[in-house]
Amino acid sequence: MAVGLGPLSTLHPVPGFELGIASAGIKRPGRKDVVVMRCAEGSSVAGVFTLNAFCAAPVTLAKQRFLGEVRYLLTNTGNANAGTGEAGLAAAAQTCAKLAELAGVAETSVLPYSTGVIGEPLPVAKIEAALPAALADLAEDRWAEAAAGIMTTDTLPKGASRQFVHDGVTVTVTGISKGAGMIKPNMATMLGYIATDAKVAQGVLQDLLRDAANKSFNRITIDGDTSTNDCCMLIATGRAALPEVTQASGALFAALKQAVLEVSMELAQAIVRDGEGATKFVTVQVNGGATHQECLDVGYAVAHSPLIKTALFASDPNWGRILAAVGRAGVANLDVSKIDVFLGDVCIASRGGRAASYTEEQGAAVMAQAEIGIRIELGRGTCSETIWTTDLSHEYVKINAEYRT
């Protein structure tokens, strides 16, 4: 059950960006599993992609094409088209070619995305058969339906939207994401699509997305597995009656950057809240590092520890497991006598051992909550990083043991 994640809030339409949904029956008959997105002519597009060496065929194709003119994004669920070799690349290209033919655009202006089971051939004929219905469904107000259409093991659709006013003009930023397992992005299975009607030069848009992703999608982890199919795209349609953003400065850029970051963080945290089998939403904050990287190393050592994650599931304040994870994070010359560890606001460990004021009852009270904070003070410098993760439950094992059945 998703932790603190309710129904979708209002997802504002983005002028110049349309979405259409259809059923191809890839994994289950009747399921809406194909989503087509249409970008207005002249849109600029940015993308960040998985660093997994076995990246999926659609990722390879999208990376090759997104810097050119982009008119359509084609997403299917139920099949990842990963681990499929040259045949997978040909299949992805074939579905793009069919959509391009139906829409009357260049084949290279169609970007493919897939999510689902790895290693199975893409059912090209089923996807092609669903394309006319998806095109007929295109509309600017279909964000919620598209959010549901890209789900796999997700239990709830994920979306976020922000608006701000600049010089009397309303600018919209809206996005959707999917993912619940195989989540440890490095830009899981994670897909994210964000659109704005601001007009933004491609280079500025790319930097804006990369910065937002590094503070959101690249700071979440459920199981430590980086997917073959991770992608996050940011589309700027330019339909808002404002000057083009051509550099990373000025009031319009600052407002847009904040809106994109807020949408990205909400989408990323929604993925964690809906983590497979998750019963806890956990914020791991590491402060006082000499570098940002060592803060991340410590944070991920804690967030990825099966012993800590199972203790979280059991609501067991086993603070020794946290100390052990910090100690094996690989931080050079770590002085444990300077480290303090907190569960919520409760200091559980200080100067290398149990805090003098700590009681088991205090720790148990924090661990019983659905949302838990673990704060680690390294006492080495001024750098900080935050990571969001989950516990590890019986249900996670069950979901993944039965995934292909």
UniProtKB/Swiss-Prot annotation:
Cross-referenced Pfam families: ArgJ
One cellular component term from this protein's GO annotations in UniProt: cytoplasm
Biological process (GO), any one: L-arginine biosynthetic process
Site annotation Cleavage: residues: A188, T189
GO molecular function: glutamate N-acetyltransferase activity; L-glutamate N-acetyltransferase activity
Active site: T189 (nucleophile)
Main localization, broad class: cytoplasm
Pathway where this protein functions: Amino-acid biosynthesis; L-arginine biosynthesis; L-ornithine and N-acetyl-L-glutamate from L-glutamate and N(2)-acetyl-L-ornithine (cyclic): step 1/1; Amino-acid biosynthesis; L-arginine biosynthesis; N(2)-acetyl-L-ornithine from L-glutamate: step 1/4
Subcellular location(s) per record: Cytoplasm
Taxonomy, superkingdom: Bacteria
EC number: 2.3.1.35, 2.3.1.1
This protein's UniProt keywords: Acyltransferase, Amino-acid biosynthesis, Arginine biosynthesis, Autocatalytic cleavage, Cytoplasm, Multifunctional enzyme, Transferase
Binding of substrate, residues: T152, K178, T189, E276, N400, T405
InterPro entries: Arg_biosynth_ArgJ, ArgJ-like_dom_sf, ArgJ_beta_C
UniProt site positions, description: Involved in the stabilization of negative charge on the oxyanion by the formation of the oxyanion hole: T115, G116
Catalytic activity: N(2)-acetyl-L-ornithine + L-glutamate = N-acetyl-L-glutamate + L-ornithine; L-glutamate + acetyl-CoA = N-acetyl-L-glutamate + CoA + H(+)
Enzyme class: transferase
NCBIfam families hit by this protein: ArgJ, PRK05388.1
Entries under HAMAP family matching the protein: ArgJ
Family: Belongs to the ArgJ family.
Functional description taken from the UniProt entry: Catalyzes two activities which are involved in the cyclic version of arginine biosynthesis: the synthesis of N-acetylglutamate from glutamate and acetyl-CoA as the acetyl donor, and of ornithine by transacetylation between N(2)-acetylornithine and glutamate.
Subunit structure: Heterotetramer of two alpha and two beta chains.
Designated name of the protein: Arginine biosynthesis bifunctional protein ArgJ
Organism: Pseudomonas aeruginosa (strain ATCC 15692 / DSM 22644 / CIP 104116 / JCM 14847 / LMG 12228 / 1C / PRS 101 / PAO1)
Native organism taxonomy: Bacteria, Pseudomonadati, Pseudomonadota, Gammaproteobacteria, Pseudomonadales
Gene that this sequence comes from: argJ
